[in-house]
């Protein structure tokens, strides 16, 4: 048994004396003193262990092999003090056991089970190392601080044969005494979380096992005291089955490819990924460095139209073409712009579909009488119409940017084709073409710049001559147009200085150059001669503007008619009130006269005269108001007729425009399908596919518009129906929710006649005037109803022509309402004659009663 010294005295075994610089110092930490001062029979053979490295270890220095034991012990004591302080910024030295399979750095547990102190130390760059006790020298190439991005170190580490000895220890689980570490994974990160993890490594503390019960009790009491003072209990070390000679041989054989067999592995606690992940990251970084020349600003995205994909045929086939990678690079650069154009066209299709759906909803809510919802839908439809006006159908190949680039590509193709033709006719067919093309392009660049400057100056001179010489305006304008066109061609060549297509074009064969040149020429020529016309012509736009102005006029006149009818209704209520009060006052006057109350009779007479004067003024004002309302009604009828006629013309012209647009779209689709089936250029194939998908979206939009109502007249139809309802309510049916308004003027006249029968001394003149006013009012209403019937007849003819079943049923309901109104007025006019005869006989009856 070792340790024959006195109890509690520090014992240094011969192994410590061999290399005291690597032994465990007695003053590493206060909580470790109790564990190191055990009796000799309770301590195992002292060997090398695992500890923290000092900052000096992480730096290469020439005198590292010549450290004395005193210096090593001093540095270890400082490292122990730093290791006990969780907040310290120093790094401890790690000196430990020999490089054995059973004493290597274990796998780190998952972060979810770490102690809070360990989590706080996770981001601190603490260095540790594993090295052999028999050699104090350190390898300068492995003592540097490791960073997560230093993939070269991990490649060297992974390629080392000595790392194979780490596998058994990485799979070994820890004892129950290691707190805070629950899950052990193989091949985990070689990073630790702080001093607590280093203190809990297997083999860090002196271990001892015994079968004596009093020794086991002593060990348990020492462990409890260590836990109470903040030190983890000791753990059982795995048996060491390897001799030092075998270890030295294994270490030398594992380090043979790297030079010095005795080296120090230095790690960083920031390294969180596993070794397999680091190898994968290294491989992915190497792949990214190889693909660094490819632009990553855009990505290849597909398009939604399956028909365009199927009709493409050989459009995307880049096989057999020179430098297919270059064409795919161009595709990736232009794909986002093509997708933007297609998204705009798809949005227009969505807006058209939404407009048609909202039209149907608006018709339903108008039929249900929910005018608030109808107004909300009308506003939404106006917003959608504005958005649809901002969007425009256009082929992507005719957009300015893409069209300019295709022109530039066509110019480069022409230059390459010319060079290929010259090369084919020369004596040396093997002469390099790319150098000639680059020289030609470089020589033509200064000439193009000079030509551009001269063209700008010439254009300015010609503009001044145009201002001075009006007589030569036509000739100079023609010359200016030619110069502007040439200037635009030169600008196209100078607009893409950073896009070098010569390297791509130079690798194409003459046949491919001829094919691409022909395809580009057809595309640009068709765009210049017959552009993709989707916008309506000027006549159709002017007709739409006129229809909108008439629609606003219909709204204004309808509002005036409705307000006039409301004012007439309020005047009628006031007249009805006066008609109710006057007979009562007349009766009270008669009672006062019969009772000889002449003063009361005089007051009642004055009040009767005042009310009669007010009634006369109201009747005069009501007559003027009725005349104004009648004129507004006639104007409304005329404007609505013009509006209906404009709508019919607009529908005819719009249908003709859609027919022409549909025919042009079908023709364009046929041309694009033919081009896609014959061209093998990837870029042109993708552009033509985008054009084909745009044409398909336009056809879907036209089909939706044909299935539903016309999108340009949806708001006018709703307002038109609203105006018709208002006019019908104002002219045909006198709707008065007030109980007194339910009385017709004839009924008021009958009540007046009934009350006047009680006062025979009243004159019959006012009743004749009332009868005349009522007759005039009834005549005006009959005239308005006649105009309304004519208007309804025109609308019925239009509904029959357009086969609009909903409008036809609505007009039938309005006609039925007008018929009922006419029948009611006829019934009211029949007792009018009887009332007139009775009013004529009232004075005679009154005179007879007076004589009696």
Curated annotation (Swiss-Prot):
Presence of keyword Endoplasmic reticulum: no
Region (Disordered): 1-86, 236-264, 280-320, 706-746, 833-852
Bias-annotated ranges (Polar residues): 65-79
Cellular component GO terms, alphabetical: cell body; central region of growth cone; centrosome; ciliary basal body; ciliary base; cytosol; dynein complex; GABA-ergic synapse
Single GO biological process annotation from the record: positive regulation of neuroblast proliferation
Chain residue ranges for the region called Interaction with TRAF3IP1: 295-693
Sequence segments annotated as region (Interaction with NDEL1): 802-835
Tissue: Expressed in granule cell precursors within the dentate migratory stream during the first week of postnatal life and in differentiated granule cells of the hippocampus (at protein level). Detected in heart, brain, kidney, and testis. Expressed in dentate gyrus, hippocampus and in the olfactory bulb.
Subunit structure: Interacts with NDEL1. Interacts with CCDC88A (via C-terminus); the interaction is direct. Interacts with GSK3B. Interacts with tubulin alpha, ACTN2, ANKHD1, ATF4, ATF5, CEP63, EIF3S3, MAP1A, NDEL1, PAFAH1B1, RANBP9, SPTBN4, SYNE1 and TRAF3IP1. Interaction with microtubules may be mediated in part by TRAF3IP1. Interacts (via C-terminal) with PCNT. Interacts with CHCHD6. Interacts with CCDC141. Interacts with FBXW7, the substrate-recognition component of a SCF (SKP1-CUL1-F-box protein) E3 ubiquitin-protein ligase complex; the interaction targets DISC1 for proteasomal degradation.
Protein name: Disrupted in schizophrenia 1 homolog
Protein's organism: Mus musculus (Mouse)
Originating gene: Disc1
């Amino acid at each position: 048994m070792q340790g024959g010294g006195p109890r509690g005295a520090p014992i240094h075994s011969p192994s410590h004396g061999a290399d005291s610089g690597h032994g465990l110092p007695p003053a590493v930490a206060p909580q470790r003193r109790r564990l190191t001062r055990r009796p000799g029979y309770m301590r195992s053979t002292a060997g090398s262990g695992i500890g923290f490295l000092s900052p000096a270890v992480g730096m290469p220095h020439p005198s590292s092999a010549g450290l004395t034991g005193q210096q090593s012990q001093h540095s270890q004591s400082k490292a122990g003090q730093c290791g006990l302080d969780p907040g310290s910024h120093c790094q401890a030295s790690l000196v430990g056991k020999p490089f054995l399979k059973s004493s290597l750095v274990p796998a780190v547990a998952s972060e979810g089970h770490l102690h809070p102190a360990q989590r706080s130390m996770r981001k601190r760059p603490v260095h540790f190392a594993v090295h052999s006790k028999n050699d104090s020298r350190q390898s300068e190439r492995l003592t540097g601080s490791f960073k997560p991005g230093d993939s070269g170190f991990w490649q060297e580490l992974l390629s080392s044969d000595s790392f194979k000895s780490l596998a058994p220890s990485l799979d070994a689980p820890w004892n129950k005494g290691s707190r805070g570490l629950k899950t052990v994974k193989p091949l985990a990160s070689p990073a630790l979380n702080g001093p607590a993890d280093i203190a809990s490594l297997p083999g860090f503390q002196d271990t001892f096992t015994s079968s004596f019960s009093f020794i086991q009790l002593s060990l348990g009491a020492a462990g409890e005291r260590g836990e109470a003072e903040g030190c983890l209990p000791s753990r059982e070390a795995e048996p060491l089955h390897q001799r030092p000679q075998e270890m030295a041989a294994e270490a030398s054989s594992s380090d043979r490819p790297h030079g010095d067999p005795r080296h120090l592995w230095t790690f960083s606690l920031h390294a969180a990924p596993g070794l397999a992940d680091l190898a994968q990251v290294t491989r992915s970084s190497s792949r990214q460095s190889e693909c660094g020349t490819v632009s990553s600003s855009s990505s290849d995205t597909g398009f939604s139209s399956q028909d365009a994909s199927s009709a493409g045929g050989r459009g995307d086939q880049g096989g057999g073409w020179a430098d297919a990678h270059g064409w795919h690079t161009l595709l990736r650069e232009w794909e986002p712009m093509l997708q933007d154009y297609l998204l705009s066209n798809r949005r227009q299709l969505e807006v058209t579909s939404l407009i048609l759906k909202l039209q149907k909803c608006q018709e339903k809510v108008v039929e249900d009488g929910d005018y608030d919802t109808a107004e909300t839908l009308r506003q939404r439809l106006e917003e959608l119409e504005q958005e649809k006006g901002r969007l425009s159908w256009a082929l992507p190949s005719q957009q300015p940017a893409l069209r300019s680039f295709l022109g530039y590509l066509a110019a480069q193709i022409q230059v390459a084709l010319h060079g290929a033709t010259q090369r084919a006719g020369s004596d040396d067919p093997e002469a390099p073409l790319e150098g000639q093309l680059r020289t030609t392009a470089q020589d033509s660049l200064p000439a193009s710049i000079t030509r551009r400057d001269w063209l700008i100056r010439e254009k300015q001179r010609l503009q001044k001559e145009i201002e001075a010489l009006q007589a030569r305006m036509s000739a100079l304008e023609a010359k200016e147009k030619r110069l502007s066109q040439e200037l635009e061609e030169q600008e196209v060549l100078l607009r893409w200085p950073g896009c070098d297509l010569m390297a791509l074009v130079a690798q194409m064969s003459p046949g491919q150059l001829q094919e691409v040149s022909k395809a580009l020429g057809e595309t640009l020529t068709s765009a210049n001669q017959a552009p993709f016309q989707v916008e309506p012509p000027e006549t159709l736009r002017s007709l739409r503007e006129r229809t909108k102005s008439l629609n606003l006029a219909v709204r204004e006149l309808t509002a005036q008619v409705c307000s006039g009818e409301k004012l007439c209704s309020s005047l009628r209520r006031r007249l009805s009130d006066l008609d109710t009060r006057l007979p009562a006052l007349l009766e009270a006057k008669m009672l006062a006269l019969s009772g000889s109350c002449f003063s009361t009779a005089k007051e009642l007479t004055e009040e009767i005269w005042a009310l009669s004067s007010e009634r006369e003024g109201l009747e005069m004002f009501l007559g003027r108001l009725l005349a104004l309302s009648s004129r507004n009604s006639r104007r409304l009828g005329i404007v609505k007729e013009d509006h209906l006629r404009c709508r019919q013309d607009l529908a005819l012209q719009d249908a003709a425009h859609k027919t022409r647009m549909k025919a042009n779209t079908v023709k364009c689709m046929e041309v694009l399908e033919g081009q896609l089936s014959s061209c093998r250029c990837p870029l042109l194939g993708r552009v033509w596919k985008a054009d084909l998908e745009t044409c398909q979206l336009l056809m879907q939009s036209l089909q939706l518009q044909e299935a539903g109502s016309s999108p340009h007249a949806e708001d006018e139809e709703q307002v038109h129906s609203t105006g018709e309802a208002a006019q019908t309510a104002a002219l045909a049916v006198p709707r008065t929710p007030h109980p007194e308004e339910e009385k017709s003027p004839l009924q008021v006249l009958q009540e007046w006649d009934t009350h006047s029968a009680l006062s025979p001394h009243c004159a019959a003149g006012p009743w004749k005037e009332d009868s005349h006013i009522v007759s005039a009012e009834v005549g005006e209403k009959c005239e308005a109803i006649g105009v309304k019937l004519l208007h309804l007849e025109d609308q019925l003819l239009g509904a029959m022509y357009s086969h609009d079943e909903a409008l036809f049923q609505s007009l039938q309901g309005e006609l039925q309402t007008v018929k009922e109104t006419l029948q009611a007025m006829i019934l009211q006019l029949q007792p009018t004659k009887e009332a007139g005869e009775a009013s004529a006989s009232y004075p005679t009856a009154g005179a007879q009663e007076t004589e009696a």
